[in-house]
């Protein structure tokens, strides 16, 4: 269960990073 949550959190972080990159552009 914990591993699943971690994966979900990582995915969300990755998504946020992508958005930040676009904002910088």
From Swiss-Prot:
* InterPro entries the UniProt entry points to: Ribosomal_eS32
Region span, Disordered: 1-25
Q: Which GO terms label this protein's molecular function in UniProt?
A: mRNA 3'-UTR binding; mRNA 5'-UTR binding; RNA binding; structural constituent of ribosome
Write out the GO biological process terms.
cytoplasmic translation; translation
Location of this chain's protein in the cell: Cytoplasm
GO cellular component terms? cytoplasm; cytosol; cytosolic large ribosomal subunit; endoplasmic reticulum
- Key words, A-Z: Cytoplasm, Ribonucleoprotein, Ribosomal protein
This protein's assembly is summarised as:
Component of the small ribosomal subunit.
Q: Which family does it belong to?
A: Belongs to the eukaryotic ribosomal protein eS32 family.
Q: What else is known?
A: Initially thought to be part of the large ribosomal subunit. Crystal structures show eS32/eL41 to be a small ribosomal subunit forming a bridge at the interface of the 2 subunits.
- What is the recorded function of this protein according to its Swiss-Prot or TrEMBL entry? Component of the small ribosomal subunit. The ribosome is a large ribonucleoprotein complex responsible for the synthesis of proteins in the cell. Interacts with the beta subunit of protein kinase CKII and stimulates phosphorylation of DNA topoisomerase II alpha by CKII.
The identity of this protein, by name, is Small ribosomal subunit protein eS32
Which gene specifies this protein's sequence? RPL41
């Amino acid at each position: 269960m914990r591993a699943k949550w971690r994966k979900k959190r990582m995915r969300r972080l990755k998504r946020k990073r992508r958005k930040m990159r676009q904002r910088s552009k």
